[in-house]
Amino acid sequence: EVYELFGGDLKRYPGNFTHYEKVREVELKTLIAAYEQQQQEIHHLEDFIRRFGYKATKAAQAQERQKQLDKIVRIELPESLKKIHFKFPPAPHCGKLVLRLNGITKSYDGIKNVINNLDLTLENGERLVVVGRNGAGKSTLLRILSGEDKNFVGEIIPGSGVQIGYFSQDNAETIKGSTSILDYIESKAPTELIPKVRDMLGAFLFRGDDVFKTLDVLSGGEKSRIALLQLLLSPVNLLVLDEPTNHLDMHSKDVLMNALKDFGGTVIFVSHDRGFIEGLSTKVLELTPGKFREFPGDYKYYQECL
């Protein structure tokens, strides 16, 4: 049997650990679904009260909504569960083929081929990690795939309906202005996710009054986290991520990894975080200077092949 301490309560689960994991997963999904449904209801009530509370013609209805709001027994998620509570907007539909690369070659100063005659096919739903030593061309390849670098030889054929979202540390430079963090992210979030913005910001280490900081006063690392969250709220179906776990703590990395595993699109990423790579990858592309090898399995499979 298994005993779990969760949210301050100790609960007993009969059976072995495998049985416990299955039962607990169902319980957590049920709790999260109920929480999300209630948060949506609360948001609708609060929105009506905010918009019509001061209009004489709607005052009675607003008061009735306030009574409904006051009667709600709120579902509380334990802090440990909130840390893993994040969902993407639905990914736009695209075909099975996401990208095909034919003979991609990239050199600097016309002397050295960092990437040489690279061929690659990426299909919908795959999560490709690009690995290799520093200087092997990992970030260069991601810039090419994202369209940021067009100075290369070869051909990139995107699939039907593919919409690319690209993240690198340079994205932080776009986060500026006198808007608060909360207002900025709410302006980027789809309507159905606005009630969950505070939870999302908390998952990315913006908690309490931090959400009222203006963008201009944020550090580079904080701006990078905001840029990443903004991208994750965008309607894309191919995410190209260069070191997305930089500036995240352990729990936030878990948030990101679990969200990406549930993402309805395709992911190409570079990371130095071994746990993140092992937990997320379904396919590996190894780059060495001027060479490449593709492995049709996760990172553990790649390690076994070495």
What is each of the regions a protein language model found here?
Residues 86-88:
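Post-kinase regulatory C-tail/linker adjacent to protein kinase catalytic domains
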Residues 1-35, 82, 91-306:
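ABC ATP-binding cassette signature C-motif
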Residues 23-78:
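Intracellular alpha-helical coupling/juxtamembrane segments of multi-pass membrane proteins
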